[in-house]
Regions:
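Repeated loop/turn-to-beta-strand initiation elements of outer-membrane beta-barrel proteins
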Residues: 33-34, 60-66, 88-93, 123-131, ...
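Hydrophobic, lipid-facing positions within transmembrane beta-strands of outer-membrane proteins
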Residues: 33-39, 48-52, 75-79, 112-116, ...
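Sec-dependent N-terminal signal peptides
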Residues: 4-13
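Detector for outer-membrane/organellar transmembrane beta-barrel domains
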Residues: 106-171
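Outer-membrane beta-barrel biogenesis signature
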Residues: 17-42
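Transmembrane beta-barrel strands of outer-membrane/channel proteins
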Residues: 37-43, 66-70, 95-101, 116, ...
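Glycine- and aromatic-enriched membrane insertion/assembly motifs of diderm outer-membrane
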Residues: 45-92
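Outer-membrane beta-barrel "beta-signal"
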Residues: 184, 188-191, 205-217
């Protein structure tokens, strides 16, 4: 029974860890540091999650880093490697591999996440754009998962190097064997900082809301 519970927690936490803001193909840049942290809540129930990552650029295309996910009764630490290629304004491609370990089980390996990030402009000025994230998660002792997110976004420039970018999209399994979920939100850019407010599961009794912040130094 304990093993079944642990497997269920691992499945839920890996899906939650993926359900972040949209990721773009490019990496942070040579010698630069990228950081992101978020808090996820479901009003009406005691279900808080956090996700934090730091990534350091190695050249123009590579980055390496760590992440930490915490949820109800679970905590996972991961080490990651990321690659990004800006092909042109219309399409960019990136990939990431993260190996995650269970901090509550003596740092035991739990799951391996492979991600494909793509994005590009739709309009000539680049304000209207698309973004796609594909996630393949290989679990230790349970079924693997394959999911995809597609988003449309529009950047509204403001004064003093600021902007606001609303986005809307869908979350679904790769085989479309589960209900398609709607995700929406926006981020507010202040120079090298972004403030995020995101959400999904809007049609459920306890929707999920995400508040986050990231930076590049």
């Amino acid at each position: 029974m304990r093993k079944i519970v642990l497997i269920l927690i691992m499945l839920l936490s890996s899906v939650s860890a993926m359900a972040q803001i949209p990721y773009y193909a490019g990496t942070v840049g040579d010698g630069k540091l990228y950081g992101y942290t978020s808090l996820k809540v479901r009003p009406g129930i005691n279900h808080q999650e956090t996700y934090t990552t730091f990534q350091y650029g190695l050249g123009d295309h590579w980055a390496t880093g760590v992440d930490l996910y915490t949820g109800p009764d679970c905590a996972y630490w991961g080490g990651l490697v990321r690659y990004g290629l800006n092909i042109n304004k219309w399409i960019n491609v990136g990939a990431e591999v993260t190996s995650s370990f269970d901090l509550n089980r003596s740092f035991k390996f739990s799951y391996l996440t492979s991600a494909l990030y793509m994005n590009g402009a739709i309009s000539q000025d680049g304000r209207l754009f698309w973004c796609s994230n594909t996630w393949w998660v290989v679990h230790d002792g349970s079924d693997n998962t394959f999911s995809n997110y597609e988003y449309l976004g529009y950047t509204i420039p403001l004064k003093n190097h600021r902007a606001i970018t609303p986005m809307v999209g869908t979350i679904h399994s790769w085989k479309f064997d589960q209900d398609v979920d709607i995700a929406a939100g926006f981020y507010y850019t202040i120079k090298n900082w972004n403030l995020y407010l995101w959400g999904n599961d809007f049609l459920k009794s306890h929707p999920r809301f995400i508040a986050g912040i990231d930076f590049t130094l």
